[in-house]
């Protein structure tokens, strides 16, 4: 069996396994609560949806497991809960539990981040701007501008983002398929030879521009930046590593803005507790996903994610065609 066939079978098996696990988990949760009654209290958090602690934990798992894999966490946080009958948790809940993912990035890349901070300070003091740390810091800063600009623009122009076309299942499916094809093209055309130590600040701007596409659910922030990194010939693991660092400002800003918006609504304890559970769950599973992906990409290609995204998009379109989710 060829590596590509193996990747396809692995992606297909993963898709089926995830669907079965979610289906079984939902069936168990409905038939017989796993948590004590006092632990499944619900509170309206965002988008008019009540989320209990079990659901918050599962949503945190989905966020953590998919945020740093090039398969779109936003798409899965929209599609999976709807498939389970929970409803769309909304932009606010999704953005807040992403703070757990950012905590995982700080946890995993603490030495890199402190090195970048020290490098920037030293470069400013000595006026020598050719160090890798300064280039990384500058690249992250410049690369954050596009997504912040277009994110603010979208917030101004789209009044009800939760129920807009941008968060529709059809948009998610099409975006997933298109990005799968682009990732496949990047795998084919990229040389995958440029190491992390050869990163330039211009790479941050290029990958940051690609990151802005992730405002469309289904595109995937890590997927778009990883794809851009492969197109500019970075090693797979190097592209992933910089992608994670690049996402820190954007995800943090989005999470804090939505958190402030929720806190301004004077949420009850029943609503705050699921946010805490979801964020902690997201942090733990994000850390595991980061560690796994970097190790995986040191030896393997991204074809498994190409096939997964194709299958994911086709399954959603098929389900919509059969009348589900409408």
Curated annotation (Swiss-Prot):
<dbReference type="GO" id="GO:0000270">
    <property type="term" value="P:peptidoglycan metabolic process"/>
</dbReference>
<dbReference type="GO" id="GO:0008360">
    <property type="term" value="P:regulation of cell shape"/>
</dbReference>
<comment type="function">
    <text>Catalyzes the dephosphorylation of undecaprenyl diphosphate (UPP). Confers resistance to bacitracin.</text>
</comment>
<dbReference type="Pfam" id="PF02673">
    <property type="entry name" value="BacA"/>
</dbReference>
<dbReference type="GO" id="GO:0005886">
    <property type="term" value="C:plasma membrane"/>
</dbReference>
<keyword id="KW-0573">Peptidoglycan synthesis</keyword>
<protein>
    <recommendedName>
        <fullName>Undecaprenyl-diphosphatase</fullName>
        <ecNumber>3.6.1.27</ecNumber>
    </recommendedName>
</protein>
<keyword id="KW-0812">Transmembrane</keyword>
<comment type="similarity">
    <text>Belongs to the UppP family.</text>
</comment>
<keyword id="KW-0961">Cell wall biogenesis/degradation</keyword>
<dbReference type="GO" id="GO:0009252">
    <property type="term" value="P:peptidoglycan biosynthetic process"/>
</dbReference>
<keyword id="KW-0472">Membrane</keyword>
<keyword id="KW-0378">Hydrolase</keyword>
<feature type="transmembrane region" description="Helical">
    <location>
        <begin position="272"/>
        <end position="292"/>
    </location>
</feature>
<keyword id="KW-1003">Cell membrane</keyword>
<dbReference type="GO" id="GO:0046677">
    <property type="term" value="P:response to antibiotic"/>
</dbReference>
<feature type="transmembrane region" description="Helical">
    <location>
        <begin position="165"/>
        <end position="185"/>
    </location>
</feature>
<dbReference type="GO" id="GO:0071555">
    <property type="term" value="P:cell wall organization"/>
</dbReference>
<dbReference type="InterPro" id="IPR003824">
    <property type="entry name" value="UppP"/>
</dbReference>
<keyword id="KW-0997">Cell inner membrane</keyword>
<dbReference type="GO" id="GO:0050380">
    <property type="term" value="F:undecaprenyl-diphosphatase activity"/>
</dbReference>
<feature type="transmembrane region" description="Helical">
    <location>
        <begin position="304"/>
        <end position="324"/>
    </location>
</feature>
<keyword id="KW-0046">Antibiotic resistance</keyword>
<feature type="transmembrane region" description="Helical">
    <location>
        <begin position="242"/>
        <end position="262"/>
    </location>
</feature>
<feature type="transmembrane region" description="Helical">
    <location>
        <begin position="11"/>
        <end position="31"/>
    </location>
</feature>
<feature type="transmembrane region" description="Helical">
    <location>
        <begin position="212"/>
        <end position="232"/>
    </location>
</feature>
<feature type="transmembrane region" description="Helical">
    <location>
        <begin position="138"/>
        <end position="158"/>
    </location>
</feature>
<feature type="transmembrane region" description="Helical">
    <location>
        <begin position="90"/>
        <end position="110"/>
    </location>
</feature>
<keyword id="KW-1133">Transmembrane helix</keyword>
<keyword id="KW-0133">Cell shape</keyword>
<feature type="transmembrane region" description="Helical">
    <location>
        <begin position="42"/>
        <end position="62"/>
    </location>
</feature>
């Amino acid at each position: 069996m060829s590596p590509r066939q193996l990747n396809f079978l692995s992606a297909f098996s993963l898709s089926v396994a995830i669907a079965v696990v979610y289906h079984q988990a939902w069936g168990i949760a409905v038939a017989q609560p796993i948590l004590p009654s006092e632990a499944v209290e619900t509170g309206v958090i965002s988008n008019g949806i009540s989320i209990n602690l079990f659901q918050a934990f599962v949503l945190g798992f989905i966020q953590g497991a998919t945020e740093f894999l090039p398969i779109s966490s936003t798409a899965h946080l929209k599609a999976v809960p709807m498939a389970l009958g929970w409803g769309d948790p909304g932009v606010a809940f999704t953005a807040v539990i992403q703070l757990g993912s950012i905590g995982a990035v700080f946890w995993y890349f603490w030495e890199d981040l402190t090195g970048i901070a020290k490098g920037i300070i030293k470069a400013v003091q000595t006026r020598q701007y050719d160090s890798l740390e300064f280039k990384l810091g500058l690249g992250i800063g410049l690369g954050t501008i596009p997504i912040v600009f277009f994110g603010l623009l979208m917030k101004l122009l789209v009044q009800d983002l939760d129920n807009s076309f941008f968060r529709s299942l059809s948009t998610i499916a099409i975006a997933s398929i298109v990005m799968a094809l682009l990732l496949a093209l990047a795998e084919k055309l990229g040389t995958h030879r440029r190491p992390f130590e050869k990163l330039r600040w211009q790479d941050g701007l290029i990958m940051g521009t690609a990151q802005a596409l992730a405002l469309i659910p289904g595109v995937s922030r890590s997927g778009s930046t990883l794809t851009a990194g492969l197109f500019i010939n970075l090693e797979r693991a190097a592209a992933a590593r910089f992608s994670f660092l690049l996402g820190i400002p954007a995800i943090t800003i989005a999470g804090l803005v939505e958190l402030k918006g929720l806190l301004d609504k004077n949420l009850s304890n029943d609503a705050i507790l699921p946010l805490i559970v979801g964020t902690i769950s997201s942090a733990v599973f994000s850390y595991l996903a980061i560690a796994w992906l970097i190790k995986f990409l040191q030896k393997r290609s991204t074809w498994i994610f190409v096939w997964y995204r194709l299958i994911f998009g086709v399954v959603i379109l098929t389900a919509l065609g059969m009348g589900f989710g409408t």
